Design a protein with these regions (language model features):
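Short beta-strand/loop element within the Bergerat-fold HATPase_c
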Residues: 55-65
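Short alpha-helical Gxxx[C/S/T] motif in the catalytic ATP-binding
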Residues: 105, 109
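Conserved micro-motifs of the catalytic ATP-binding
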Residues: 29-32
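Acidic ATP/Mg2+-coordinating residue in the GHKL
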Residues: 73
């Protein structure tokens, strides 16, 4: 997972924006279609760049039998009552009305995460903007009758 995140960070960083990182050390193994996850992360970063004020952070980690990656920004954020609707195609938050966009970015992210048996959450970032976190299952195999994460 971190290798895919690193590729997106490298591609999306540049003279227009710098991306802070908080990637868990070491490998995070998940079953994924790398191009799809790249598309999801890129959509999340573009969303953060479009609606934020310049600060973007991409992080990853694991918790129990799940891995996660997230993108945070320092924009106006999304009101809690609007969050559940943002994953629907063509729906945009109130703070997005003054900027260009189709309202498809988070719907595409939701579809990709769903296709990976994952879960998508919206919250507030450490700087008051939007935090989008995707949870993906960590594969488990049986070894000597015991379950073990790979």
């Amino acid at each position: 997972l971190n290798a895919v995140l690193g590729e997106v960070i490298a591609a999306e960083s540049g003279y227009e924006r710098e991306i802070d990182t908080g990637l868990q050390e070491g490998e995070i193994i998940v079953r994924m279609h790398p191009l799809s996850i790249k598309r999801a992360v890129a959509n999340m970063v573009v969303n953060a760049a479009r609606y934020g004020n310049g600060w973007i952070k991409v992080s990853s980690g694991t918790e129990l039998n799940r891995a996660w990656f997230q993108v945070e920004d320092d924009g106006p954020g999304i009101q809690p009552e609007q969050r559940e609707h943002l994953f629907q195609p063509f729906v945009r938050g109130d703070s997005a009305r003054s900027t260009s966009g189709t309202g498809l970015g988070l719907a595409i992210v939701q579809r990709i995460v769903d296709n990976h048996n994952g879960l998508l959450e919206l919250g507030t970032s450490e700087r008051g903007g939007l935090c989008i976190r995707a949870w993906l299952p960590i594969p488990v195999v049986r070894q000597n009758g015991q379950l073990k994460e790979v």
